[in-house]
């Protein structure tokens, strides 16, 4: 399936690494996310700036000059520019500071509240399960456990094996 067809189906993806156009400004990166849209994207850009105020401050700065956490916010924002039904996040907090991690999780919750489905692969299992409606524990690529985020957090075997006790 062509990428534009996936976008038209409402799917958006934020990769873990190499997730911004480093030679473009923050705003140009966001505009790239809205490239296939036929409507006016300015309202969505403003929504992204409301979600990530630091991006508005840095909108004319090259994305290549940003910190890892700020780049992650640009990538997240660019994906939101497609107005997705489902947002897929690959390790959204990898390599970011604890403060940025907490902020990203808060923003994920905000996006989820708008009705966008979130499919996330995340190294910080405890925090991810804390916001998850549904969770899956994979071992060697196979589904080992599944349940609500709360069920998995409270499962003694999951806690011992995957959550540090």
For the regions a protein language model found, what residue spans apply to each?
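ABC ATPase NBD coupling module
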Residues: 1-18, 22, 41-45, 57-60, ...
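ABC-type ATPase nucleotide-binding domains, specifically the catalytic core motifs of the NBD
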Residues: 1-3, 26-43, 51-56, 147, ...
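Conserved ABC ATPase signature
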Residues: 62-66
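ABC ATPase C-loop
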Residues: 79-80
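Conserved catalytic motifs of ABC-family nucleotide-binding domains
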Residues: 83
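Catalytic Walker B motif of ABC-type/P-loop ATPase nucleotide-binding domains
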Residues: 87-91
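Helical segment within the ABC ATPase nucleotide-binding domain
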Residues: 102-114
């Amino acid at each position: 399936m062509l990428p534009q067809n996936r976008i038209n189906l409402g799917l958006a993806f934020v990769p873990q690494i190499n997730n911004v156009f480093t030679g473009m400004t923050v705003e140009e990166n966001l505009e790239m996310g809205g490239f296939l849209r036929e409507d006016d994207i300015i309202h969505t850009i403003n929504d992204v700036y409301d979600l990530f105020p630091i991006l508005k401050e840095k909108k004319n700065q090259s994305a290549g000059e940003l910190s890892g956490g700020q780049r992650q916010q640009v990538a997240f924002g660019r994906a939101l520019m497609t107005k997705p039904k489902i947002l897929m996040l690959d390790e959204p907090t990898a390599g970011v500071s604890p403060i940025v991690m907490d902020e990203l999780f808060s923003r994920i919750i905000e996006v989820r509240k708008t009705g966008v489905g979130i499919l996330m692969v995340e190294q910080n299992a405890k925090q991810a399960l804390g916001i998850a409606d549904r969770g899956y524990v994979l071992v060697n690529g196979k589904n080992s456990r599944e349940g609500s985020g709360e069920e998995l957090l409270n499962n003694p075997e999951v806690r011992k094996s995957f959550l540090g006790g």
